[in-house]
């Protein structure tokens, strides 16, 4: 939830895809994720829209799809319903314990990187620095609150879920009906880019490429 659109730097799609990147925006006071997504959706124009979101961005693009017509939704390292949240987050929602979570540690970049991508990147901290520019404390507190309290019960139609089997943020044991990548962590968009470059176009077959618009949302 702290990453920017540079997480898509290694993704290379055919020229007939018209790609637009959606950068994060600061939420308005007391704005829900539904209201936030409605505001973002007004910036999206075109036909045959495919929304792609990573992690918290995967939740946001699902909310955006409730306001605009989409051809397909692709989420990566994310969740489709509240039931796919890990047990600790589900307990946090019930007890409100997450409100005690202090995000002051974001000033320590290493702690932030380990939280977002998992301990597997410990030896590559500096390589990930450019991807984690969203470090506003108010924003992170808001996103944690919206994530833990997301209440979606049923996934949208025409959704494709791609997930790493070794994801520690959203453990695969809680994930239903997804394409699982062996050895994949929460950072598969970076570490499995060759797989995405080969397989994403296959996921977008039967689209009129004259009108296609891909909206790539960062890990908001």
Language model features by range: what are they?
Residues 69-102, 213:
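Flexible "cap/lid" loop of the alpha/beta hydrolase fold
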Residues 1-28:
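Conserved HGGG/HGGXW glycine-rich cap/lid loop of the alpha/beta-hydrolase fold
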Residues 30-31, 184-199, 214-219:
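Catalytic histidine-centered segment of alpha/beta-hydrolase-like enzymes
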Residues 18-20, 34-49:
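Conserved acidic catalytic loop of the alpha/beta-hydrolase fold
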Residues 105-151:
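Conserved alpha/beta-hydrolase catalytic His-Asp/Glu region
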Residues 161-163, 167:
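Short beta-strand/loop motif that positions the catalytic acidic residue
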Residues 22-24, 174, 179-184, 190-192:
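Short glycine-rich catalytic loops that host catalytic nucleophiles or stabilize transition states
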Residues 52-61:
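Gly/Ala-rich beta-loop-alpha elbow adjacent to hydrolase catalytic centers
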């Amino acid at each position: 939830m702290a990453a920017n659109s540079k997480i898509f730097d290694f993704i290379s799609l055919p020229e007939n895809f018209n790609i637009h990147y959606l950068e994060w925006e600061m939420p308005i006071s007391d704005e829900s994720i539904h209201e936030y997504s409605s505001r973002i959706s007004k910036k999206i124009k075109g036909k045959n829209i495919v929304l792609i979101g990573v992690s918290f961005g995967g939740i946001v693009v699902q909310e955006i799809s409730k306001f605009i017509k989409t051809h397909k939704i692709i989420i990566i390292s994310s969740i489709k319903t509240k039931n796919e949240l890990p047990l600790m987050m589900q307990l946090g929602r019930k007890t409100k314990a997450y409100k005690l979570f202090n995000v002051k540690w974001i000033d320590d970049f290493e702690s932030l990187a380990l939280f977002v991508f998992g301990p597997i990147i410990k030896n590559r901290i500096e390589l990930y620095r450019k991807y984690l520019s969203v470090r506003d404390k108010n924003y992170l507190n808001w996103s944690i609150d919206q994530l833990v309290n997301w209440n979606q019960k049923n996934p949208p139609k025409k959704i494709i879920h791609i997930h790493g089997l070794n994801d520690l943020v959203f453990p695969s044991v809680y994930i239903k009906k997804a394409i699982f990548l062996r050895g994949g962590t929460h950072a598969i968009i970076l570490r499995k880019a060759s797989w995405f470059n080969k397989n994403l176009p296959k996921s977008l077959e039967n689209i009129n490429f004259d009108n296609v618009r891909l909206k790539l949302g960062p890990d908001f």
